[in-house]
Amino acid sequence: MSFIKETKKWYFIFLAVWTLIADVPFLFMLFTSFKTQSELLSGNTWQIPRQPTIGNFSTVLEGNFFTYLKNSVIAVSISVVLILIISSMAAFAFSRFKFALNNLLYSLIIAGMAIPIHVTLIPIYVLTNKIKLYDTVFALIGPYVALSLPMSIFILTEFMREIPLELEEAAKIDGCSMFRLYSDILLPLSAPALITVGIYNGTYLWNEFVFALVLTSSPTRRTLPLGIWDFQARYGSDIPAIMAFLTLSLLPMLIAYIFGQDKIIKGMMAGAVKG
């Protein structure tokens, strides 16, 4: 009994230390965003601001922040919706239909996870120019969706394969069509996996930098990760303003998590147990 208590004590100590370590970058970002440039350079980097100021946030909001935010919301939200629709349909086909090329097609799609996504930059750039989508927010949606599909299809297919076939057979006996089987039965049962896929892709695409850099050039077409450039000069950078920009960029994802944390945690836990 004492051994179990001792183990639990060290376990909680480890979690507390790990939480503190994980929070250090966030605390640095938050503290620095309320400092002036002179205070940051002259004082202790890690100390709490002596004279907190919201001037950095005012500077950020007076710039193009809301334009970058709008572009990010458009690109990410449309991409995630398309990813969920396409990957769930593909997973439904791979998990429920038996056809000649089922395993081959599924293997080819999964093999896409092994391809470094940035090797496609030049072909995508050339294609985007040819179809006149370069330097638009919509130029990002195609690559975002295509490059996210292999992992998404893999997660959803493996999840749907665990759903008992008896449910499908009972639905067919009751006259359920294939579309209703997909939309009314498998999709609700796959909600945990869909939530996991949505979180995974939404978080990654919100912070995606390279494709946004290559496929857009105008300041009015940039997404949030590119907006940091507004505070970088030739001989230095406004670090407090950059930290304020990052803090504001984090808020939408943080707010979404706060209001949906119950569903997110239940979905991810259920997905882990189901798999």
From Swiss-Prot:
Domain of life assignment: Bacteria
Pfam families in alphabetical order: BPD_transp_1
Membrane topology: Multi-pass membrane protein
Residue ranges annotated for the ABC transmembrane type-1 domain, each copy included: 69-260
Compartment(s) of residence: Cell membrane
Transmembrane residue ranges: 11-31, 74-94, 108-128, 136-156, 185-205, 239-259
Main location: membrane
GO terms under biological process: transmembrane transport
Keyword Membrane among UniProt keywords: yes
InterPro entries, sorted: MetI-like (IPR000515), MetI-like_sf (IPR035906)
UniProt keyword terms in alphabetical order: Cell membrane, Membrane, Transmembrane, Transmembrane helix, Transport
Classification via PANTHER family: ABC TRANSPORTER PERMEASE PROTEIN MG189-RELATED, ABC TRANSPORTER PERMEASE PROTEIN MG189-RELATED-RELATED
Similarity comment text for this entry: Belongs to the binding-protein-dependent transport system permease family. MalFG subfamily.
Protein name: Putative ABC transporter permease protein ORF2
